[in-house]
UniProtKB/Swiss-Prot annotation:
It holds the Pfam family Ribosomal_S20p. PANTHER family: 30S RIBOSOMAL PROTEIN S20, SMALL RIBOSOMAL SUBUNIT PROTEIN BS20C. This is Small ribosomal subunit protein bS20. It comes from Bradyrhizobium sp. (strain ORS 278). The gene is rpsT. One of its GO terms (biological process) is translation. Gene3D superfamilies: Ribosomal protein S20 (1.20.58.110). Keywords: Ribonucleoprotein, Ribosomal protein, RNA-binding, rRNA-binding. One of its GO terms (cellular component) is small ribosomal subunit. GO terms for molecular function: small ribosomal subunit rRNA binding; structural constituent of ribosome.
């Protein structure tokens, strides 16, 4: 339990940030899921459109320390690679 005024304020700030970060993480996951769904369906055009939305969200999440930057880069790389495989078919 926070005893000092500054600790109580920090607790309130953490609670606010947690809500914002959860929201951003949920949006990011939804964007990635839409890319993965398009890839599973084999729809390259839909996958590219979804990727245009997902990549900035992943990088923004990394920039705001919601996920690690290497994690974001790895996810983007893997999704782009899967979309490229669709083009080869």
């Amino acid at each position: 339990m926070a005893n000092t005024t500054s600790a109580k304020k920090a607790t309130r700030k953490i609670a606010r940030r947690t809500i914002i970060n959860k929201s951003r993480r949920t949006q990011m996951r939804g964007a990635v899921r839409s890319v993965e769904d398009a890839i599973k369906k084999g729809d390259r055009e839909a996958a590219l459109k979804a990727m245009a939305n997902a990549e900035p969200q992943l990088m923004r999440a990394a920039q705001r320390n919601i996920i690690h930057k290497n994690n974001a880069s790895r996810k983007v790389s893997r999704l782009v690679h899967q979309i490229a495989k669709l083009a080869a078919k």
